[in-house]
Curated annotation (Swiss-Prot):
UniProt GO BP: biotin biosynthetic process
Lineage top rank: taxon: Bacteria
Residue ranges occupied by any AB hydrolase-1 domain in the UniProt entry: 14-242
Family per record: Belongs to the AB hydrolase superfamily. Carboxylesterase BioH family.
Annotated source species: Tolumonas auensis (strain DSM 9187 / NBRC 110442 / TA 4)
Protein name per the record: Pimeloyl-[acyl-carrier protein] methyl ester esterase
Name of the coding gene: bioH
Localization in the cell: Cytoplasm
Cellular component aspect of the GO annotation: cytoplasm; membrane
Quaternary organization: Monomer.
C-alpha cells in the first residue's frame, strides 16, 4: 500500500513531514500562504492518518526515511516538524543530491535531555510510552496540550490540533510506539556537520519539548545554518504564527536559490 500524500499548488516541490501522533492535515494554516508559490506534498507518515495501514519492515529511522523518500520527487525542498524533522535530517544526510534545502521546525537532532544538552526529561517520554499502551487517544491529546503550552493562542492551537487529528483515521498503535522510540533514542548530533544543503531552523521560545536553550547548540552543529525564534510561539509556530512562519520560510528559500535543471 502506498502512503497518502496530498499534493497542492504549483512551483518548486516542497515536502512537509508532520510530527508524532498527527497527520498531514496539521499544515492547514500555512497551505493557503504557500500554495501560490510551491507544489506542496503533504505527507501522512507511515502508520498515521490515511497512511495508517502502511507497514514498514522495521522501525529504524533510516527505514522511515527510505519508505517516505521512495514516493517523493527526484529533488525537493523539505520541511520537517518535530519527529518529522528527525526523518527529514536522515533523508538529507543519506541523500544529499535529493534535498535542495531543509527547514526544521520544533525539531532537534536529539530530543532526549542529556548532559549539557537541553531536551525532554526521560521520565516524560517513558510516561507517555506507558500511558500509550492504556489509552492512545487520551495520550495523544495530552501530548497536544503539552506542545501548545506557552503559546499566546494555546486554547485555539489545541482545538485546531484536535480537529485536524479527528479528520483522519487514528494512528496505528505500532506507529505511535515506534515514533516515541525515535524521540527517545535517536541522536544525530555527531552527523550534523555532514549536511550539505542550506538549513533553516524555526523555533518557538515557549517550546517545552525543544527548549529555546537548544537553539544555539543546534545552530553551531550545522555549518552555515540560521535560526528564527518566535518569542510567543511554542512547539508549533506554523499554527500559532502562520503568517510570520510562511514569510520566514519563503525568505529563506528565496535567499538560497537553487540552480534547477
Amino acid at each position: 500500500m502506498n502512503m497518502y500524500i496530498e499534493r497542492i499548488g504549483q512551483g518548486p516541490d516542497l515536502v512537509l513531514l508532520h510530527g508524532w501522533g498527527l497527520n498531514g492535515a496539521v499544515w492547514q494554516e500555512i497551505v493557503p500562504l504557500l500554495q501560490p508559490y510551491y507544489r506542496l506534498h503533504l505527507v501522512d507518515l507511515p502508520g498515521f492518518g490515511y497512511s495508517r495501514d502502511v507497514i514498514m519492515p522495521d522501525s529504524r529511522l533510516a527505514t522511515w526515511s527510505e519508505t517516505v523518500l521512495a514516493e517523493l520527487p527526484a529533488r525537493f525542498d523539505l520541511l520537517g516538524w518535530s519527529m518529522g524533522g528527525l526523518i527529514a535530517l536522515r533523508m538529507a544526510l543519506d541523500h544529499p543530491s535529493r534535498i535542495n534545502r531543509l527547514i526544521l521546525t520544533g525539531s532537534s537532532p536529539c530530543f532526549l535531555r542529556q548532559d549539557n544538552w537541553p531536551g525532554i526529561h526521560p521520565d516524560v517520554l517513558s510516561g507517555f510510552n506507558c500511558a500509550l499502551q492504556q489509552n492512545p487517544r487520551k495520550t495523544i491529546e495530552r501530548f497536544l496540550a503539552i506542545q501548545s503550552m506557552g503559546s499566546e493562542s494555546v486554547k485555539e492551537d489545541v482545538k485546531r490540533l484536535k480537529s485536524w487529528l479527528q479528520q483522519r483515521p487514528d494512528a496505528a498503535p505500532a506507529a505511535l510506539s515506534a515514533g516515541l522510540a525515535l524521540l527517545s533514542s535517536v541522536d544525530l548530533r555527531t552527523e550534523l556537520s555532514q549536511l550539505r544543503c542550506p538549513v533553516l531552523g524555526i523555533y518557538g521560545r515557549q517550546d517545552s519539548l525543544v527548549p529555546a536553550a537548544a537553539v544555539d547548540p543546534i545552530e553551531k552543529l550545522i555549518t552555515g545554518s540560521r535560526s528564527v525564534v518566535f518569542a510567543q510561539a511554542a512547539h508549533a509556530p506554523f499554527i500559532s504564527h502562520p503568517q510570520q512562519f510562511s514569510e520566514a520560510l519563503r525568505q529563506f528559500l528565496e535567499q538560497n536559490e537553487i540552480q534547477r535543471d
